[in-house]
Amino acid sequence: MSTDKQAAVAVVTGASRGAGKGIALALGAAGATVYVTGRSQRDGDADLPGTIHATAREIDALGGRGIAVACDHRDDAQVAALFERVAQQSGRLDILVNNATFLHDDLIKPGPFWSKPLDLVNILDVGLRSAYVASWHAAPLMVRQRRGLIAFTSSFGASCYMHGPGYGAQKVGVDKFAKDMAVDLREHNVAAVSIWMGMLDTERTQRVMQQHPEQYAGFAAMAESPQFTGRLIDALYRDPRLMEKSGMVLVGAELAQQYGIRDIDGRQPPSHRAMLGGPVQAHPAKVE
């Protein structure tokens, strides 16, 4: 994975399950040391299956090195301790994947935003603010080594109405983080990108499909595996022209076509740009 003989060191936030777990597994399969963060340490800690320790063990089995770190991304002190541990234990950080996101059980419940619980907006804490805090700690490590990639997981919810305004604002926010952090990081040869994932075949969506089979008929044929985005991040980090993509908001399925990457089942997931809209790239103007 790494451009030199050292295996890359990555931090993937929110990796007990879902997209974060899949990304961590894909990076581990490429040989990386992966710090996986989350709050779920034991089965039953969350309504959905998965723990950070289970993810770390799967990374080990795939040939990487998984390191589970319990971290509540609402707590800045815990996040600071995470990156201090990475620096002391590994001496470097090559990839940060900002994925941890608060997803309320009522997120996809039909109805206007005011009819849903107010704490749906906590996605702007764990999901937006948390990504800034993690990047703030990661950036100095990458700047020091003059190499690194900060990736944000995002979606077409930044373009169209999807799950309500809180969800959309979080996606737009991390896209803007990628654009603006790239400006600050460019002279240090550190890249920042945001990746729009498509529909994901995760533990959460599998449960929803079981509850509403007719509504989600045909979903599997279009869905991306959680590992798919991890394969893209691996390819991005290896790309000698990575800095040309820094600051961009990338549709994952389209990036996969550029790199010739397929999903774990051999399929080429489709882009939903025509149906859901596409990303708006940054204007080149810079105002200090």
Identify the residue ranges that each predicted region occupies.
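Active-site loop of short-chain dehydrogenase/reductase
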Residues: A7-A8, G64-R65, R92-L93, P110, ...
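C-terminal helical subdomain
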Residues: S194, Q211-E288
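A short, exposed helix-loop element centered on a Lys and neighboring polar residues
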Residues: S135-W136, K179
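Canonical Rossmann dinucleotide-binding motif of NAD(H)/NADP(H)-dependent dehydrogenases/reductases
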Residues: S2-R39
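The beta1-alpha1 cofactor-binding region of Rossmann-like NAD(H)/NADP(H)-dependent oxidoreductases
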Residues: G50, A70-L82
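Catalytic loop of short-chain dehydrogenase/reductase
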Residues: F102-D106, W114-D119, I123, L149-E187, ...
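Conserved glycine-rich Rossmann-like NAD(P)H-binding loop of the short-chain dehydrogenase/reductase
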Residues: A30-A54
